[in-house]
Amino acid sequence: IEIPDINVLQLLVAQGAVVICNGGGGIPVIRDANNHLQGIEAVIDKDLSSAFLAKQLGADALLLLTDVEAVYQGFGTPDAQPLSALTIAESHALDLPAGSMGPKITAACSFAESGGFSAIGRLSEALALLSGQAGTHIVAEHS
């Protein structure tokens, strides 16, 4: 797996740019026998590709921004509770189907496993999310 032209993104980051990308709509490609890129029919998961890109760029943090304040235990039920922090092990025990927070949790865990800070929360609370004041933070283990 690779991100074509990642060197351009690395250059932008090295110059101090904030890189916002992998928001969906990417074009999946493979390399043909002549090492040329060729489009294929496939789906690119924006959360997983964002975690992959963040690792490739050596990012300190991965914020997965959405329209809900946090990951919820029992989402959609009267007993729903927002989760402020989850360990990787705890996240695996949650029942989060693919159409819900499942891919975001998988991506956040992947990045956290590599030693990075990962969090899921509202776009409007991105700064608070980054500082640990909002959303759900995925950690290797509780401290």
Indicate where each model-derived feature is located:
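C-terminal catalytic "cap/lid" subdomain
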Residues: I1-S143
